[in-house]
A protein has these predicted regions:
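Helix-biased detector of long, well-ordered alpha-helical tracts
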Residues: 1-214
């Protein structure tokens, strides 16, 4: 199938972040497993899994921390190039959310090679590369597997001054909440999958999801 005729969302059981495990299931998986070392006072780990932040943070000295995050999901739009852009934006923006700046990214690609042509995956990667270029970082490699449904995302590294490190548990009563993007893209992505989204709404949602949260 050619990339200009396929509808990627039809190969996805749930659009975008809708394919995440439920909090209950994730808690059941993680509870028996110790996956960070914050209890160890000698560990350079500043932010691990316990606070459910957007990225892990490791003290690398000189007042700076290395940020590490990964994010991938099933198609949230039908256009392969835009899917790559949105996936890359989602992963890179986790670094910005922690107060840092991205330095490098590597790709995570799962592709049903018996259902979707390699050229479609190339379009996804091209979209991601464009977004990485916009963020000023290289898409420096990655890993791919043959699976039954398409997934794509990035693992991204970044740097942050520790004094500027932002965590999601620091909000105080009375703080002002700023939204950097409008709400509702999840509803629109579900409508896309079911063929019920209006073209103007799709374009607005895609533009929002492709915009880096810098």
């Amino acid at each position: 199938m050619e990339s200009n005729t396929i509808k990627l969302t039809q190969f996805s059981p749930a659009a975008g972040c809708g394919c995440k495990l439920s909090p209950e299931t994730l808690r059941e998986i993680l509870t028996p497993v110790e996956i960070d070392a914050l209890e160890d006072s000698t560990s350079p780990l500043l932010v691990g899994n316990s606070s459910r932040d957007d990225a892990a943070a490791i003290d690398i000295g000189d007042g700076r921390a290395l940020l590490s995050t990964t994010d991938f999901f099933t198609p949230i739009v039908d256009d392969p190039f835009e899917f790559g852009q949105i996936s890359a934006t989602n992963a890179i923006s986790d670094i910005y959310a922690m107060g840092g700046h991205p330095t490098v990214a590597i790709a995570i690609l799962g592709w049903p090679v018996d259902k979707l042509a390699p050229s479609v995956a190339s379009s996804v990667l091209a979209g991601a590369r464009q977004t990485c270029r916009e963020a000023g970082i290289a898409l420096a490699g990655g890993h791919s597997i043959d699976i039954s449904e398409p997934i794509f995302g990035l693992a991204v590294s970044g740097l942050v001054e520790i004094e500027n490190l932002k965590q999601n548990n620091a909000a105080q009563h009375g703080d002002t909440l700023f939204l950097t993007k409008p709400l509702g893209v999840g509803i629109i992505s579900t409508a896309i999958k079911h063929g019920k989204a209006q073209r103007d709404d799709v374009e607005l949602a895609s533009e929002s999801m492709r915009s880096l949260n810098r």
